[in-house]
């Protein structure tokens, strides 16, 4: 394992080499052929896997148990946007816990880099890394989840996020440009919507947040709606009926 000083010197050399357009892959080994995998879609079964992490080997399905999961990838360790993202996820752990959600991050960097980067995150973001970070150095998970574009640099995952429910079904997938950090409040908002609408015959309208009014599904007839929503509802159109958010 590199010391902090040795790693800093190595990264400095790498940065200068990249600026000159001659950077070598910092991970040893022959070039890896990235073969496109079938793209995941909403409603697909989330691929299971076993991979090393900062909290030991992770077998996804066993690790999740009956929980929801947020799996998110980042392009590289020791990068500014990713550092702020991981700090935010760590700070939001009580919110994830409240919703029975486990967060797990991923990059194709080795475990030794993750361990060193965790110290930087604690120093700069003021919070310890309190969730596992997958060391997907063999790109196994990245390929399963289509996180590496076949025409992109094979050593960097795209900035993706997946919400997986307790049935191991993909409920959301979203990919951001490398320059844009994710909004994890929005991730929580989507989880709130999914957990609410899984149990009730409602959908959540534009810019909805927990506690706001919801809309009644068009499949529910008015006679049934009268029983299901005792707080009443406002019918703006036969297909647009607004009701206070019911309790689950």
What are these regions (language model features)?
Residues 2-248:
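Chalcogenol-based redox active-site neighborhoods
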